[in-house]
């Protein structure tokens, strides 16, 4: 009997022992379908983004909400917490089923700070405000998280380090990034360092569609529906993936890898993180264990033992972090929380300033420094030209012209001569076009509760 036949036989016996029924197969099929359509999750994974919100919820985010909306009830605060979770990973919406990678590329590489500031300015109620504050958490997370992951990938993969140096960016090896990020999540779950899945289920996960629709054309000069052509389906599948499929796959991976998880080692950065975690009071009420294995988890873990780690399953073949890379992770989390607290204080004082950062490098977005940024600017410019720059605001015009201020730079776009000629023609059109000042309205006023 071949090894492939033996694998199929083992899976069949294991599934039979668990009495796999038709409805179980359907549930598993839906989960696998979502996973198959997920194209990538750069920077911190979902659980880490949500944890950043949890670490500052009680002493900063909650009070900020009450400062602006003083009559909020406990139930309304809980609902706002769900929207903060949604905002904390909204920049990654395009990487989920039925989403648009173009959406995530724009908010990662083009006017990333302006996008978050405009979400805050346009928010009208507590849910929208919480959603915007969550998006600010993502901004803080990515500008410190990406450089840390870039370094960790280089440490975990010597061949990549030899090729790219001590920092391996997402565009240079997607798979290594996914494995590294997922490995960080697995270790934290294994050691009970995240708010429990029971707590996440209680809070929920929400997306402020109307706020996104108002904000996106102001920042990028095109309507959201042009980028997310199946907007409702994209948001719905995104919520399902974050609240159901990803936690399920986390439990599956944990079940299959837990014996190999690294042992604890003394470390100052880790202790600082754990101290902050203990100050959160979620553990008292909800327990610290990630949700226990259920039927689906047991079946999935059996199937995945024999499934080749290719395509969307590559991340499940992650390497456990080393003591050195886990230290990088903790330091980046601590830096993120410290910086996020500063941003929240600036929000409270109406003095928030955010640099338009390239999330993958953690540096200000500039031409010829990152291939994905170059390509994203070129595509946006082409789309704006197709619309005769009708929704192009003065700030957007200045941002694009600033990006292309030195045409002698070795931009990635120049590798395609036709695309580069299109960029040059569109730039000439933009320079001769009067921007639409009405696109940038005065910030919306809070809606009283």
Each model region followed by its residue ranges:
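N-terminal secretory signal peptides that target proteins for export/translocation
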Residues: 1-22
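Bacterial N-terminal signal peptides
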Residues: 26-38
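Short, low-complexity Pro/Thr/Gly
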Residues: 27, 247-255
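N-terminal, motif-rich segments that launch catalysis or mediate targeting to/interaction with membranes
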Residues: 41-130, 143-225, 255-260, 271-449
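Catalytic glutamate of the conserved HExxH
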Residues: 135, 139-143
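Mature extracellular/secreted ectodomains of secretory-pathway proteins
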Residues: 137, 250, 265-266
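Ordered core of a single globular domain
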Residues: 225-233
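Eukaryote-specific, cytoplasm-facing alpha-helical/coiled-coil scaffolding segments in long proteins
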Residues: 235-245
């Amino acid at each position: 009997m071949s090894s492939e036949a033996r694998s199929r036989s083992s899976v069949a016996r294991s599934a039979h022992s668990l009495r796999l029924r038709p409805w179980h197969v359907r549930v598993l099929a839906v989960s696998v379908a979502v996973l198959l359509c997920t194209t990538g999750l750069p920077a911190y994974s979902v659980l880490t983004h949500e944890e950043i919100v949890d670490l500052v919820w009680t002493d900063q985010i909650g009070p900020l909400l009450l400062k602006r909306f003083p009559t909020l009830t406990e139930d309304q605060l809980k609902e706002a917490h769900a929207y903060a979770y949604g905002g904390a990973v909204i920049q990654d919406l395009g990487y989920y089923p039925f989403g648009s990678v173009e959406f995530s590329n724009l908010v990662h590489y083009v006017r990333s700070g302006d996008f978050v500031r405009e979400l805050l300015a346009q928010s009208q109620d507590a849910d929208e405000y919480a959603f915007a504050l969550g998006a600010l958490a993502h901004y803080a997370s990515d500008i410190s998280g990406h450089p840390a992951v870039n370094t960790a990938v280089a440490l975990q993969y010597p061949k990549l380090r030899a090729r790219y140096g001590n920092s391996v960016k997402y565009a240079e090896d997607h798979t290594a990034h996914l494995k590294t990020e997922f490995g960080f999540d697995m270790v934290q779950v294994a050691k009970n360092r995240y708010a429990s899945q029971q707590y996440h289920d209680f809070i929920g996960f929400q997306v402020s569609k109307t706020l996104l629709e108002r904000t996106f054309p102001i920042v990028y000069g095109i309507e959201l529906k042009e980028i997310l052509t199946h907007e409702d389906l994209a948001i719905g599948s995104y919520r399902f993936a974050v609240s159901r499929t990803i936690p399920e796959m986390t439990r599956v991976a944990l079940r299959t890898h837990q014996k190999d998880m690294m042992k604890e080692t003394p470390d100052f950065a880790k202790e600082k993180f754990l101290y902050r975690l203990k100050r959160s009071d979620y553990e008292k009420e909800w327990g610290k264990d990630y949700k226990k294995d259920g039927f689906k988890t047991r079946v999935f873990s059996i199937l995945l033992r024999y499934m080749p780690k290719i395509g969307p399953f590559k991340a499940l073949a992650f390497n456990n972090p080393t003591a050195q890379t886990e230290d990088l992770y903790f330091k980046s989390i601590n830096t993120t929380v410290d910086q996020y607290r500063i941003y929240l204080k600036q929000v409270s004082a109406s003095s928030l300033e955010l640099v338009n950062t390239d999330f993958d490098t953690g540096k200000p977005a500039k031409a010829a420094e990152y291939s994905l940024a170059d390509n994203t600017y070129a595509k946006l410019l082409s789309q704006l030209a197709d619309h005769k720059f009708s929704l192009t605001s003065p700030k957007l015009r200045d941002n694009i012209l600033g990006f292309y201020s030195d045409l002698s730079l070795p931009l990635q776009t120049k590798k395609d001569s036709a695309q580069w000629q299109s960029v040059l023609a569109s730039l000439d059109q933009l320079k001769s076009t009067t921007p639409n000042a009405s696109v940038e309205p005065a910030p919306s006023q809070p809606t009283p509760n």
